[in-house]
Amino acid sequence: MAIGERIHFFRLLRGMTQKYLGMTLGFPEKSADVRLAQYETGSRTPKADLTAALAEVLDVSPHALSVPDIDSYVGLMHTLFTLEDNYGLKISEMDGEICLKVDVRKNKDAARLHEMLWTWREQAAKLEAGEISQEEYDRWRYHYPEYDSSQIRAKMPPEGLI
């Protein structure tokens, strides 16, 4: 999914218009919506400073906006192949279902990814058990790794996200 699609997704999630978001970022009122439309459609790509400003206004991590190319199934497959090469991601089958798992023996990066995925699973389990709301879960995901308690420099999460 391209950065423009992520901007669009989070803008709608926050109930903002293109004009409002553009003006909040400092674009002139006359062209704010056009400028945002250019970023959302991919005809323009925001530089790092604008990506950081967008993330701040949209209340997400800049990492939530910048994701690999998963716009097509082929792009997604190559992303998974790269994860296999670099992080020990393995595909298997269990009870007729496709499963992805991390081979922690591959290298220290694979072990770290395994820890991060385990933390994600813990948050998902809290959501499934009703211990946290969908909003709290989404806040954890969209601000990752800010509220990840397994990270050394993690900030204190909102109530319920521990």
Per-range role (PLM):
Residues 145-158:
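Short, charge-rich amphipathic alpha-helical segments embedded
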Residues 47-51:
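Long, hydrophobic alpha-helical segments
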Residues 52-131, 160-162:
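Charged, helix-prone or intrinsically disordered regulatory segments positioned adjacent to compact structured domains
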Residues 134-142:
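Short, charged, amphipathic alpha-helical segments
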